[in-house]
Amino acid sequence: MTRSEAREQAFIVLFERIFNSDLTIAEIIDAAQEEGLIKINGFAASLLQNAQENEDAIDKLISENLKGWAINRLPKVSLAIMRLAVSEMLYIEEVPVGVSVNDAVELAKKFGTADDATYINGVLGAIAKSL
């Protein structure tokens, strides 16, 4: 599995968690793997663990860089993608920030809209400059 594929699998879990916030990441992974819906490798597991453990800090950083939006009004796809990317940017040192941003934009193009991709690129670009 490539890192891009691992990010997509992690995105799916984070997106699901938005709708099932009473479940842990581990519970969502277990249920989805039992159904054969996802495969989580070590890289994806690390992204997810960091995203869950640091969700408040990640959301604060995202909120500080939103232009014209409140975090609770963001499309859920965009929120999950940004949480994933910021988790990677902050806590996975061996991945260049530009790679995290680019893959987030690609996820937005696949699962969201062109407008989502553009907005996510802008927000993550602002976050990258602040790091």
Task: Please provide the spans of the model-predicted regions.
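N-terminal interaction/assembly modules
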Residues: M1-A117, N121-L131
